[in-house]
């Protein structure tokens, strides 16, 4: 439920999901064929429900989970996916009921307890979230997701040192768990510590196809002296999502600010404006590019165009005054 790998670029979910749908379609077909020959296998319905939920096909996911629970009403995996479905629907009450039911059916399984901790954290009930984490760790000290949640709770209170210790413990217990690696990288990035790069790279090895991670890594690279590597990351993202304006905008920004490649910057900002003509940021940076090229006529024309629709846009006001 808790999205620890939150992205910073807009309109990404729609594009990402379309890619995931094409990737997962064959997997869904395979599972569907297996269901035809083994229609009483609840786990198969759970697997297909997960894929449908990933692709935002909520009604299909619900149908599959209902099928799984009609076969085995105490199937914990089915109940956990059902809780995620309710989360997607914003139904906190049913999330709570479902997870409590899972705890009742499987009192030694820490997974529903961790999800209850996630729910409490999202609701701002930090004391309850901590109590659930403590309970999970009492049951099983080897619990990377519990330590990860403890780290997230520390982050919510601003205690990055304790958060870092818990994320490190989570990483030590499960080296292929990408979420704590990402949080560690962001903590070091906020401290301007060069260790951020090594943890981003470690996370990339674990989850090279995680678009949110690739984007965050690219942002780190461009801001820390590796513009060419940042461009490589944006290019890989654009291969998967060629119409995403944020990737082209960031490429343009790298060309403009870090590399001084004005013509390439203009190409990128124009691509953004083709997809999103109302992007003031892209239009302003196109003006900046012209200004940097010494083409003050085109630059001023763009700044004035911005001010006609956004008269309080201070950057454009300053730019016009600067040119004048």
Model-assigned labels for residue ranges:
Residues 4-66, 70-77, 88, 97, ...:
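N-terminal leader/linker segments that initiate helical-solenoid repeat arrays
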Residues 8-16, 223, 232, 260, ...:
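Terminal, low-structured helical/coil segments at or just beyond the last alpha-helical repeat
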Residues 21-29, 55-67, 89-101, 123-135, ...:
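Structural signature of tandem alpha-helical TPR/SEL1-like repeats
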Residues 53, 80, 87, 114, ...:
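Position-specific recognition of the canonical hydrophobic site in helix A of tetratricopeptide repeat
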Residues 118, 189, 219-223, 235-274:
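Alpha-helical adaptor scaffolds
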């Amino acid at each position: 439920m808790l999205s620890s790998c939150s992205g910073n670029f807009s309109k990404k979910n729609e594009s990402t999901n379309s890619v995931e749908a094409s990737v997962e379609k064959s997997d869904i077909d395979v599972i569907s064929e297996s269901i035809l020959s083994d229609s009483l296998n609840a786990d198969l319905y759970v697997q297909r429900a997960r894929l449908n939920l990933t692709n935002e096909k909520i009604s299909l996911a619900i149908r599959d989970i209902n099928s799984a629970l009609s076969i085995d009403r105490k199937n914990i995996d089915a109940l956990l996916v059902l809780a995620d479905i309710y989360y997607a629907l914003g139904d906190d009450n049913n999330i709570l009921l479902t997870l409590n039911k899972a705890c009742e059916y499987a009192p030694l399984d820490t997974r529903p307890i961790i999800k209850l901790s996630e729910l409490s954290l999202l609701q701002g009930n930090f004391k309850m979230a901590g109590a659930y984490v403590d309970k999970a760790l009492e049951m099983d000290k080897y619990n990377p997701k519990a330590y990860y949640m403890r780290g997230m709770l520390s982050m919510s209170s601003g205690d990055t040192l304790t958060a870092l210790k818990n994320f490190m413990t989570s990483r030590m217990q499960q080296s292929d768990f990408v979420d704590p690696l990402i949080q560690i990288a962001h903590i070091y990035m906020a401290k301007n510590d060069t260790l951020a790069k090594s943890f981003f790279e470690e996370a990339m090895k674990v989850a090279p196809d995680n678009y949110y991670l690739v984007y965050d890594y690219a942002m780190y690279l461009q801001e820390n002296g590796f513009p060419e590597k940042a461009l490589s990351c944006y290019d890989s993202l654009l291969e998967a999502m060629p119409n995403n304006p944020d990737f082209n905008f960031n490429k343009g920004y790298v060309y403009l600010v870090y590399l001084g490649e004005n013509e390439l910057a203009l190409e990128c900002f124009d691509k953004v404006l083709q997809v999103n003509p109302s992007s003031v940021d892209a239009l302003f940076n196109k003006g900046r590019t012209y200004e940097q090229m010494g083409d003050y006529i085109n630059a001023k024309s763009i700044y004035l165009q911005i001010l006609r629709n956004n008269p309080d846009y201070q950057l454009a006001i300053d730019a016009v005054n600067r040119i004048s």
